[in-house]
Amino acid sequence: AQLQPVMQEAYRLAYIRKPEFMGNTRTEEKDPKFKVISDLPWSEQEINERLAAYRQLSDKVEQEWHALPAQKKETYFQLVKYPVQAAAQMNNKLLTAQLARHGKADWADSDRAYDSIVSLTKRYNTTKWNRMMDFQPRRLPVFNRVERKALSSGLPEKRQAVYTWNGADCAEGVSAICEGLGYEGKAVAVSKNKELTFEFTAWETDSVEVEVRLLPNHPVEGERLRFTISLDGSATEAVSYETKGRSEEWKENVLCNQAVRRMVLPVARKASHRLIFTALDEGVVLDQIYLYMPRIK
């Protein structure tokens, strides 16, 4: 029971982006730029928040390790300590390197994370699991020590949402909660023609940018995945988010585990508002909805 929240958080963080995707590289592309470690489109704040989450997780795993009797440590190392701490160090290695490229972290910290992965894997490959684990599968660049380089460009700023909801946070509507699925583990499956209602209070401007984040699955019936957004009774046209083949959007969706659609809608000046999400096809899974002040052009 003590380990359940630890493993759930480990899976949640990896759901947002897998450890092997943290270097922003790809294995099947011909363009050489995808063989080189590069920045993720994350702000310094987002990077530090993720590093802190993994640090807290790793510390908890270490505490449990020291409390275990000797006869249980091998099993714990295999099932918990290695997968959680190796993932934490992959994130530490690559995200710290991203900060270091912009002069916001010490390169030595990235190198220490790499050394930690080597040490953890060496420990794994003893006794029962001798020579089973490889910390550099297929010798891909993402598993190497990160090359030191400096960038003159800055990191992006985190855009602040005014309201954020998980699919399960709706005020009204019927849906099936998908426990553990989604960026916060609260995505919902919405049946065809069913609605979810989200409520918010007075808005400061005459328009709102709505960002809808969905599970990037494939169509269940036919070839479409569609929804509409209605704000105070004014509905959008059907919004499609299915992908075709191995398109660039499909690849990006796989890497970040979300399909995203954005729209700007007019907002009347009133004390409260109702935003209604309607699924138009079977297979629609809503992860999150974010509301932003529209960007100034």
Give the positions of each predicted feature.
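Substrate-binding groove of N-acetylhexosamine-processing glycoside hydrolases
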Residues: 1-173, 272
